[in-house]
Curated annotation (Swiss-Prot):
Species per Swiss-Prot/TrEMBL record: Photobacterium profundum (strain SS9)
Protein known as: Lipid-A-disaccharide synthase
InterPro entries: Glyco_trans_19
GO cellular component: membrane
Keywords: Glycosyltransferase, Lipid A biosynthesis, Lipid biosynthesis, Lipid metabolism, Transferase
Keyword Lipid biosynthesis among record annotations: yes
Family: Belongs to the LpxB family.
Encoding gene (name): lpxB
Amino acid sequence: MTKPLRIGIVAGEISGDILGAGFIRAIKAQYPDAEFVGVAGPRMEAEGCKALFDMEELAVMGIVEVLGRLPRLLKVKAELVKYFTENPPDVFVGIDAPDFNLRLELDLKQHGIKTVHYVSPSVWAWRQKRIFKIEAATNLVLAFLPFEKAFYDKFNVPCEFVGHTMADAIPLETDKAAAQALLNLDGSKRWLAVLPGSRGSEMGMLAAPFIETCKLLKQKHPDLGFVVALVNEKRREQFQLAWQETAPELDFVLVNDTARNVMIASDAVLLASGTVALECMLVGRPMVVGYKVKPLTAWIIRRLVKTKYVSLANILADKPLVTELLQEDCVPEKLSAEVDRILSSDNTELLSEFSIMHQSIKCDADNRAAHAVLSLINKV
């Protein structure tokens, strides 16, 4: 009897859980008995992945913030190395979370396990010498964006451009009225989606300034509604606390649903930088990006980052399509002025550019990623 295909896999946050679930489905379409084990979120577990640790263990952002969790992160890594070296998979796939996964991949590769890193770290943006660590740690990198593959090719590091799963999943035209009906939102008024982050550290930094921003906008737009996507109960509790402390008189619709439906239902979006900014571009909604980290983290990042922009819409376009208000600029007065501007604009040209970029990364990523991994281990 043939031994089933066995894949080690680690995802570190919600976006990685979504990617991992799609990848698992694509592999199982060809190898129904394939086994997956590692660090997973609920979507990956629903596809049959055995979770040795909960994904929340790894979901921490910012250099200073990581230091506080370092002992636990090191313990999780050591236990994963022990498990995978004692029970070697056919291949290990680390999804994003590069500071954790690349170290894990290096250890596993040194033990003779083939390793794939899914989602290129932003080596083109900062700490470019990491490409040599990536080369040492991986047999293959799977990249979302065409310019990422071009960067790896310059250094002869194996990389496949697979496109982006979100670009595949989201139609080029989205239905605002249907999303509003799904979320029971009043279709006769305008809505601002408020997305202060999926991580606890992000919510802690952004909830209050985003709520203050809504307070200012309400003065100018009395009929504007605010709808907030909350990824889990912990984030809901954090937001509710900030709401009661900052502006209890304001009305927010809190939604335990994906950010995607909330953005589609809205006329404009105020969001934390990250994957959700790409998703907002793909659903075709004008946005303002706000982001803050602890001052020491910001000081370090400013000395390392090589790109002009933080949001992928701007990086893909290589121009400032989307307003980014970062750190000391991420204040209610500036945020509200920019949201007011997009609420008062036509935005047709902006949304046309979003659509062109959407099409450029819509490539059936799940299947391309699965094919690349299976090719690496000679299973195609």
